[in-house]
Each structure stands twice: as structure tokens, then as C-alpha cells.
Amino acid sequence: HTGLDFSADTGTPIVSAAGGVVVAQEYHLAYGNMIEIDHGNDLISRYAHASMVFVKKGDLVKRGQKIAEVGTTGRSTGAHLHFEVLVQGVQQDSQKFLTAGGRNLPAQQVAKADTPSGQQRSVRW
């Protein structure tokens, strides 16, 4: 299992971890309603299992902007946000990007919910 899962109630806001351009907004068999945002420098963030999506391919988004709501679409056993980071198309340890340079955006704000361990993490892009 790649990425991080953030348990949250259906309808909980999902916000962009950093500014960028929406490069994918589609339904995927495993990920359900999925969004991918290109942040430049070959860095993509992926948000999966959304119940509602508020952006489309080509949209510019800002850090902290509401892009979707938590859901349980696709291959999912309960409402949560599945968050991934890809560099040059290769999945990375998403945890490393939650504390890498820049200003803090608490991961709780990305999912607006508790982290899997119940501890708050920071997204620093």
C-alpha cells in the first residue's frame, strides 16, 4: 500500500497540499474519484476516494484550496482520503513530503481530519 490514508467522515473537505495545476480528475476503479495536481519540478500529489470533486483538469489551484470532499469511492472499506506523492511518475514515501521545506500546512488540513496514528503531521511545501 502506497501513500497515506486519513480517516474522516464523508463530506469532510479535502484541500490541496500545495499550489499547482490539476492534471487529472477522473474515476479510477481502485482510487474512485481521483485528483492529481502537478506542482512543478516533476512533483504530483494524488487525492483519492472523494465523494465530491470541485476541480477539473486544467484548473489552477492554490495551497489550502478546497478541491474535493472525503468519500469511499473505488476500492475502499470506509470514508477516508488516500494521499500520494509521485516524482517523475514514481510513487514516493508521502510522509517525507509532509515535512519537506516551505511553510507548514498541517496534514489534518489536507484531509481536515485525523491522521492514521491520530497525530498531526505537517505538509511543508
Q: What do the predicted segments below correspond to?
A:
Residues H1-W125:
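Catalytic cores of peptidoglycan-degrading enzymes
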